[in-house]
């Protein structure tokens, strides 16, 4: 639809939110195995999402489901991180899995391949396999553990747990 100049103008007049259509060119260059990993909602995200929250208006206007809106929110919220070299490390992917989920990390990785020139498709496949096989990290310290070591239940315990978790994540 976006290859023909006339149809592109018509579509953009009707749906001005689909302003990132050039990202679809990158998907067309992928092999079939990688292309098949993109579902309709992720392709729609590629057309709509940037670092702004314009996706919210799109979701409201077209009455998308909460799951689509949450998926868009996750991608938009991490948009700036997608542009860094550090994003494509296994360590960062593992952190994303801990903070959100394997599906969210997978969506971000697939989305990033179309908005960033910093990764090769071979590395994408490797990282997608890593996401699939990676065990979800579990924070090793609990409130019970801290209570055994002298902390009393309450606000102080919660602050200490949060502080330890932030250091563990970093």
What do these predicted regions represent?
Residues 1-121:
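Conserved, hydrophobic alpha-helical core segments of structured domains
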Residues 2, 107-170:
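Charged substrate- and nucleic-acid-binding regions of tRNA-handling and nucleotidyl-transfer enzymes
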């Amino acid at each position: 639809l976006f290859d023909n100049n006339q149809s592109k103008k018509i579509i953009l007049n009707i749906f001005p939110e689909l302003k990132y259509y050039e990202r679809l060119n990158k998907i067309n260059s992928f092999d079939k195995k990688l292309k098949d990993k993109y579902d309709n909602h992720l392709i729609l995200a590629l057309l709509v999402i940037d670092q702004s929250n314009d996706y919210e208006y799109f979701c409201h206007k077209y009455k998308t489901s909460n799951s689509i809106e949450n998926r868009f929110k996750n991608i938009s919220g991490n948009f700036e991180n997608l542009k860094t070299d550090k994003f494509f490390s296994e360590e960062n992917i593992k952190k994303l899995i801990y903070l959100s989920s394997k599906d969210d990390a997978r969506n971000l990785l697939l989305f990033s391949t179309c908005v960033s020139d910093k990764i090769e498709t071979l590395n994408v496949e490797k990282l997608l396999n890593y996401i699939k096989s990676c065990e979800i990290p579990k924070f090793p310290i609990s409130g019970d553990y801290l209570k055994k070591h002298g902390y009393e239940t309450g606000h102080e315990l919660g602050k200490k747990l949060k502080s330890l978790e932030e250091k563990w994540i970093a």
